[in-house]
Amino acid sequence: MKKMLLIAVAMIFVAGIASAASIVDSKHDMRTHITNETNTEVCVYCHTPHQQGTSQYPLWNHTLSAAGSYGAYTSPTLNGTISPVPNSNDGSVTSLCMSCHDGTVAVNALFNPPNVGTLGSAYTAALDGTGKIVSAANLGTDLRNDHPVNLDYQSSITNGDSGLNSAASVSSLLIGGQVTCASCHQVHDPAIVPFLRVTNTGSTLCLTCHIK
């Protein structure tokens, strides 16, 4: 009986963890930022099962930014090749993230709204009166002061950067061999603020790639 009770408690504990790590009610649940929202869908602010607005994955539903070049971080010690961050319909992970995070497009600007008239128009302090991000999550349209993205990881090693772990050891974090926003951030899991893949306590996240 005692054993069964312990198992039940453990299951409740695990379920609690799973719930806490859900995108529902997280900062990526856009319903929490729109005060008169009557839409009940969570995923719709990024994804749609039909009539996607881009020609590539992942069934993207959010209007892409029309911003020009975002620029890229440069440094005398940077050996890798950085590709321009596109804002076209190519499905680039970084361009999808920036469609909200460059602060030029409202978070509820969708290609395929769930139901006409269900998206609210009053926003919380994280958004301005037009639904654009104004908090620290607004990275702006200049990425030259941010960690490099669209960086070819292997090219850094090939060109002599001995301060990086092997590309094979971090392959699960790379998309098309590149470092992107999603290399550090897990957009669907708010368990580790701010949506980090692993904790950065003791620089754990940084040391996943960097040898220091």
Locations of regions flagged by a protein language model:
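Positively charged n-region of N-terminal signal peptides that target proteins for export
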Residues: 1-4
